[in-house]
């Protein structure tokens, strides 16, 4: 089980309570698909992903990015039991969607970059430690059901 300090809980909740999920979700997923183009293979049904401009303008990508950020709300509300909170989602991604679990880490890294860019100098070392710890636990939970 992960141990959270009061400071980490506060940092994480403060950050996510101020995020515009539509903006941050879209930017994070778009960044992942552009920087790591092999991740696009899971989004074939989302239409044209020909280049960065089409990815950034794709409403299905934007909507899925928002959905991902809202999915993190479950982890925020269950910080002491993230692994069990994401058990079904892990099964979906492993058994039905066959997503390479390393892609969760890539997306988490992109989300960290987008949050840091949004926060600017307020994204301190302590903030980064808390955000990366939180996202690492989420990534671990999503990869838990893989064989």
UniProtKB/Swiss-Prot annotation:
CDD domains to which the protein is assigned, alphabetical: Hb-beta-like
Superkingdom of source: Eukaryota
Gene Ontology BP annotations: hydrogen peroxide catabolic process
Keywords: Heme, Iron, Metal-binding, Oxygen transport, Transport
InterPro entries: Globin, Globin-like_sf, Globin/Proto, Hemoglobin_b, Hemoglobin_oxygen_transport
This protein's record includes keyword Heme: yes
Reported tissue expression: Red blood cells.
Globin domain span: 3-147
GO molecular function, one term: haptoglobin binding
An annotated GO cellular component: blood microparticle
Family as reported in the entry's similarity comment: Belongs to the globin family.
Chain's role: Involved in oxygen transport from gills to the various peripheral tissues.
PANTHER family (UniProt xref): HEMOGLOBIN FAMILY MEMBER, HEMOGLOBIN SUBUNIT EPSILON
Annotated protein name in UniProt: Hemoglobin subunit beta-2
């Amino acid at each position: 089980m992960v141990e959270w300090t009061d400071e980490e809980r506060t940092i994480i909740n403060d950050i996510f309570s101020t995020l515009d999920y539509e903006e941050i979700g879209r930017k994070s997923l778009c960044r992942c698909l552009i920087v790591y183009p092999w991740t696009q293979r899971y989004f074939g049904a989302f239409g044209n992903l020909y280049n960065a401009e089409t990815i950034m303008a794709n409403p299905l990508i934007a909507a899925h990015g928002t959905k991902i950020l809202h999915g993190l709300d479950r982890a925020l509300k269950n910080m002491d039991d993230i692994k069990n909170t994401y058990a079904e989602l892990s099964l979906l991604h492993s058994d039905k969607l066959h997503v390479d679990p390393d892609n969760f880490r890539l997306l988490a890294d992109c989300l960290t970059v987008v949050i840091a860019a949004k926060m600017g100098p307020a994204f301190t070392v302590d903030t980064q430690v808390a955000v990366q710890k939180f996202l690492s636990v989420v990534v671990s939970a999503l990869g838990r059901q893989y064989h």
